[in-house]
C-alpha cells in the first residue's frame, strides 16, 4: 500500500499526519480550525484517500502556522507515499461546481514545485479561518510534495462555496494523478525519472 506517516513539531505547531493513497475509509481530521477540518475532510473524501490528522497549533495567534504546517506535512507524506512514481498517470485535473461557484485544479507530479493560484475570495474570514490561508495551504503542499499545482476559482459569489470547490477539485485531480495506469511502463516521462 502507498502510504506515509509523519510528525512535525515546532515551537508553533505539532502535526501528526498519515496519508493512504489506496484506502479511503479512514478519515479523521482534527486541526483546531473548524472550517479547515471540513475542507480537508472533503479533499480526502472526494479524492478517495485515507487521511488522519491530529494538529495542535498556536491558534490563539491565528490559524496561519497550523494551516501552513499541515500543508507541509501533507505534501511530505504525498511525496513519500509515491515512492518511485512508476506507473502513475502523473497528471490530473478536475473542474468541480459547488452551487454557483466553479473551481479548477490541475496537477503534475513532476518533481518540480510550482504553484499558480487565481481567484478572488471576497469574505476575509470563515469562522476562525482566514480565507487567504487557502493559497498558503496549497503553496505548502506543492512545495513539500515537489508537484506543480494550478488552482483557480473561475467564478462564484459565496466564499465558502469557492474554497469548497477548490478542495474537492484538489482531491479529484490528485486522485487522477496518483492512480496507477496499466498502460504506463516505468515512469511517465521521456527523461526516465521524475
Curated annotation (Swiss-Prot):
Alphabetical UniProt keywords: Amino-acid biosynthesis, Cytoplasm, Histidine biosynthesis, Lyase
Pathway: Amino-acid biosynthesis; L-histidine biosynthesis; L-histidine from 5-phospho-alpha-D-ribose 1-diphosphate: step 6/9
Cross-referenced PROSITE patterns: IGP_DEHYDRATASE_1, IGP_DEHYDRATASE_2
Main location: cytoplasm
Record-level GO BP terms: L-histidine biosynthetic process
Keyword Transmembrane assigned: no
Subcellular location field: Cytoplasm
Catalyzed reactions: D-erythro-1-(imidazol-4-yl)glycerol 3-phosphate = 3-(imidazol-4-yl)-2-oxopropyl phosphate + H2O
Entry EC number(s): 4.2.1.19
One of the record's GO molecular function terms: imidazoleglycerol-phosphate dehydratase activity
A GO cellular component entry from the record: cytoplasm
Keyword Transmembrane set for record: no
Similarity field: Belongs to the imidazoleglycerol-phosphate dehydratase family.
PANTHER family: IMIDAZOLEGLYCEROL-PHOSPHATE DEHYDRATASE (PTHR23133:SF2), IMIDAZOLEGLYCEROL-PHOSPHATE DEHYDRATASE HIS7 (PTHR23133)
Record-given protein name: Imidazoleglycerol-phosphate dehydratase
Species of the source: Bacillus mycoides (strain KBAB4) (Bacillus weihenstephanensis)
